[in-house]
Amino acid sequence: MTHAQANTTALAPWLELNLQQFPLEYADQLSSHLPMALHALHSLGADEARMAAFFKSYSRRFDGVPAPAAEPAARDWLGVRGDWSAYSALRSYFELALAAEGRDARLRRVLPDLLPGISAVAFHGAIRLAHAVQGGHAGELVAALAYWASRWQRLPAPPQNGAACLSLTAWSERLVAGAATWRSEAPNIFLRMLEASGRPLYAELAWVAPAPAPTLLARVAELASLALGYYLHSANFTVLHMITGLRAVRVLAPWLPQDKTFQIQAQEVLTQAFVAAYMAGRVQWREIPLTAAVATWAVLADAATLSEDDHAIKLVHACRDESAAYGDPRYLQAAAMALR
């Protein structure tokens, strides 16, 4: 039995304390990774002392910034979707809705309207929600839903040009080659994604993407494999978010509609976000020597729990999760790279 299985209640107090004390963002619209990293640390086996130390260390980023105050519930969440100032009203709304409907019914109701905004704050709306679902804390689930809804951002759909579909390999090669000649200087990932969505390469690749896969999960698996390969050849910070973002979609997929129309539309949205994120990454493609033999997951998990790097912690957790889902041994290499 793992540490996480043996002590399933150890995470809740830390998530609750975070909600009571800290905001959702800090500095220049940077998403707080504290609740996500806490869940990852717990899942990787961090003990109580390590959880406390990481919480104290990370909390310094919020110096002087209070947690959001409570507000009356929004009457129509879709009417204020994408309005950051409505976060507290959305949080009150989702708190009442979850109490009335339960988790599964509420997720099935709202996720179809949230997914088109998957690019929100560089996938962090979806990423935080996936961690919240797995963490099992009702308050964090409410906060994650409200965060995604208030920061909801949909990339523009490019005009259809009737181009033929490329194979997955050819499409990926065109993305890598085309993105190498474009660079944005916007400070945040999501701003660079927005800028990328106005470029001809985005329009081209969004419409010559491979034909729809049989299911959304099948397309997620294909894109996850590509993102993993990109990371192994770049160790790129934005590609890291593509890996954790795709993991989030896989975790949330059971609550998404299964009808063919939605599944195809969801693949289009995800493909557009994938293109924009890779372009936003300013990826420097290079041959990074891979270790012939790397440590086991147990060793990497232990190392991650001692890290102060919230992104490394989350990536090791995500890679272990994705390795279990897909059986791809390259995830072990990626996790080891994140801890170097």
Q: Predicted segments — roles?
A:
Residues 1-340:
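Mature, well-folded catalytic/scaffold domains that follow N-terminal targeting or propeptide regions
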